[in-house]
C-alpha cells in the first residue's frame, strides 16, 4: 500500500490514465481522423530520416538564409503578419511556428509582428464565425447541457474567467479562436482583451526564435567561443522547458479553477470543464458531426 503512494507510482498512474484517454479518443475518431493521425506519424518519421540524411547544420543554415532573405524584403513583415492572420482560421495550424519565425527572422523586433498578427487574426476569426454561425450556436447550445453550463459559467464570471481560459494552452490557438466564437456570452472586446494576455507567451517564442537564429548561422557559430554557444543553448533549452512547464501548469490551474468556482453549482462547474476538455467533439463550430445533430 505504501508503494502506491510514492511519487513514482503517482506519475505512472497518471501516465497510464492519459494513455488510456488518448487510445479512447483515437477509437472514437472517424476513419478520416485516424488516417490523418497516421499520416502525421509517417510525416514525422520521413522528416526525421530527411534531417539525418541532409544533416541538421545544413538545414539550419538554409532556414537562416531564407529567414534573412524574408527580413531583407521590403514587405516581408507584411507577408508574415498576413500568414499569422490566415492560420488563425480553422482548420489551419502553425501559429507557434510562425511566431517563432518572427523571432528567427527579425529578432526581438519580431514580437510586434507576432502580437499584431495574433490580435488581428483572432479578432477576425471571432467576428467572421460569430456573424456566419450565430443561429447555429444558439440552436446547438439550446440542446447541449455541457455547452449551456460553459455559457452560464462564462456569463457569471465574465472577463477574468475568459482570460484564464484564453491563456491556457488547451485548446490550441486556432481551436481556441473558434471555441470563444462559439460561446455566445463572450463579447468581442472581452475576447480581444483576453488575447492581449498571451503577450508573455509570444515574447517567449520570439525569444526562442532569435536564439535559434544565432545558433543556425554558421558564421555566427564560428565567431562564438564554447562559452557563448553553451549560454545560447541553455537559454534555448531553458525557454523550451519554461514553455512546456507553464503550459502544463496553467492548464491544470484553469481546469481546477473552473471546477471550484464560488457561487456556481458544482455540477455546472464540472460540465463546463468537460465542455472545454471535449472542445473538439462538442463545439458547434469545430465538430464535423455538429451540423448533422443541430
UniProtKB/Swiss-Prot annotation:
Signal peptide: none
VTT domain: annotated span: 103-212
Cytoplasmic side: 56-74, 134-187, 251-294
Localisation per UniProt entry: Golgi apparatus membrane
GO biological process, one term: vesicle-mediated transport
Residue intervals on the Lumenal side: 1-34, 96-112, 209-229
Purpose of the protein: Golgi membrane protein involved in vesicular trafficking and spindle migration.
Name this protein carries in UniProt: Golgi apparatus membrane protein TVP38
Organism: Coprinopsis cinerea (strain Okayama-7 / 130 / ATCC MYA-4618 / FGSC 9003) (Inky cap fungus)
Recorded name of the encoding gene: TVP38
